């Protein structure tokens, strides 16, 4: 019996021998594709190649691609655990042809691998083709020799694939495995096809058409092939099991969960859910996703919390999910070495998320259980779903999971209405910023010369005027704002976090002031205003970058690379860049880290960066193939799209990253690096802001001026200033304590005097009074003192603090059956525009109308008498 790891290797080795380039799995975060939450198929990393927008050095490829289907259009989350073949994470084995081989070879490869290499019996395989694809049908029936009795033609719904409403598309051919007549279900294309007897294991897509806007299909000049075979499904077939959760990959994970829970029934849904979810969660975190409340991070949080809830069902009340990382690493680490490297980081993320959710899970489940008991029908109300989501962090699919187990449904319309109300409450006025060139389409290319020089000659290739919209023009005149596209330029276009250059474009008839530079496709777009004369398309231009703006930007960009490397050295390899801003006045770097960076760590990071600056390391760039760079250990950012050839930036042996930005020649050019701020920007994301060069020197000098002023005020030296300040703080704290003691003593004395004002009503001494000049703490102490003195009493005291009413009510324990402190304090609070609450014996409230306090307190005896009278009846 072959293991999943062996099957993965057999597949890739087979296609390597068929002259395919073996391409490593792309990240789970698709590069530059906002239409996808996650990579969900093997072809995703080749999408630009299939669309003809990217050219690679090879024309045939194969890969084992990590995929996630959870959230968005492709969402298997709700079915995971309940079926034999649904997963949030899976591996897609695929071979691809980019205008090289087509149907005959693709079909031949698939059949040979399945029947001759893997030795699957042909009589257990079933083949389908698109009903109109006679070419594929003839290859299968006439050349391969598939039996007509194990072959069917199907409609477009099952056997015609499209990338979208328009673009590349074509028929597909699917290969199914027959598990035998003892399993219910009929062959593909039959009325009984929904059964489990026949399992699709390989899909061969033949991209041979281009669908136009009108729906017309035109033949592609170079047809391509995209195939996909789920490793888990193949393993189930090869290991003789009908259920994916019985393959080796899952058996070992389920055994680990069983060991933690003590549950021996390995068919339990919860075991399967947890085993599936640990795979997707670990790989998402490895690929740089952190749990959060939006986008991909929220999908990860939903998966984690669903797993935790199923652990709760198994009796696992303490954090357990993170303990499954190690068995997963042992299972898949050989194929994906990054699992070993980032294991501790992943464990920390999962443990922290689990601890956070455990705080509210129990409480939320109790509320849901009570609401289910109170149901008048089989529908959980939308308000309940929203309350669990908003207050207790229950993703909707977690509530749906529980409903499914109880044979209940969800009022999703009511939930959406509650969500809409919340969004309306939270909606703030916003302005839409016009993005220059955001909707422009241009087929232009600019040669960038700015690595070597800040001046250059070029020719105007296109002009755009900014009116209500951006419009193409032949001429721009003085006072007009717009964009200039040159055939070559030294101006750096904003990318990789580095801001675009500023400067001037000077022609024989005009001067253009550049305020920013952006990239539109392959063109550099200069934004700004004509200051003198006019510019025309075709004019020769003298370009000059603002040196005072570019130079500090270069310093900051190089310092950002040093900072990134220093963070990974000090905090660990779990640090992953999440964003950056490289401007002329500062740099900003966002990175994954679960907690605030300690002050000692910040000093260590800063010292390390400055040590590398003093070392004056050479800053070198080299153009090389992407895979060569990755093999050399170059850091690449998840979610970034790179071409086949990349620019590698090296700073000695300390830092090596892919980068297209502008940099110093040696690290010593940076001069000085100073961290000025560290803060959190989202769950698991920290931000460091820093300055370099002259800006760093100015920051230090400003600090010196402040320190000297402080020393003067304290009448202390540099070395004694901190001690002197601590002494003053200690004195202040002691004086504040003494002040509070005196206030309490004064209030207690006043309380003794107040006790004589109490009037007895039906056996309870009632006192309502105002005490000025005290805080809530003193007021509470006075109420306690009066309760002790009056024996059987109801007391409410009020004061005014910063124009707000503070009320404290107290009722002795022997009277709480007749009157409640919460009711008493709320009665007074309503008179002064507020409300409050608390225990039957002690409650607190506030109010907005201090001028009504005295009148409100005067009403207390009558209110108490009414309460006692009604209670007696």
Curated annotation (Swiss-Prot):
Keywords: Aminoacyl-tRNA synthetase, ATP-binding, Cytoplasm, Ligase, Metal-binding, Nucleotide-binding, Protein biosynthesis, RNA-binding, tRNA-binding, Zinc. Its EC number is 6.1.1.7. Its cofactor is Zn(2+). Pfam families: DHHA1 (PF02272), tRNA-synt_2c (PF01411), tRNA_SAD (PF07973). GO terms for molecular function: alanine-tRNA ligase activity; aminoacyl-tRNA deacylase activity; ATP binding; tRNA binding; zinc ion binding. Transmembrane segments: none annotated. Its main location: cytoplasm. InterPro entries: aa-tRNA-synth_II/BPL/LPL, Ala-tRNA-lgiase_IIc, Ala-tRNA-ligase_IIc_anticod-bd, Ala-tRNA-synth_IIc_core, Ala-tRNA-synth_IIc_N, Ala-tRNA_ligase, Ala_tRNA_ligase_euk/bac, DHHA1_dom. The keyword Transport does not apply. Binds 1 zinc ion per subunit. CDD domains: AlaRS_core (cd00673). Gene3D superfamilies: 2.40.30.130, 3.10.310.40, 3.30.54.20, 6.10.250.550, Bira Bifunctional Protein, Domain 2, Threonyl-trna Synthetase, Chain A, domain 2. One of its GO terms (cellular component) is cytosol. Consists of three domains; the N-terminal catalytic domain, the editing domain and the C-terminal C-Ala domain. The editing domain removes incorrectly charged amino acids, while the C-Ala domain, along with tRNA(Ala), serves as a bridge to cooperatively bring together the editing and aminoacylation centers thus stimulating deacylation of misacylated tRNAs. Belongs to the class-II aminoacyl-tRNA synthetase family. NCBIfam families: alaS. This is Alanine--tRNA ligase. It comes from Nitrosococcus oceani (strain ATCC 19707 / BCRC 17464 / JCM 30415 / NCIMB 11848 / C-107).
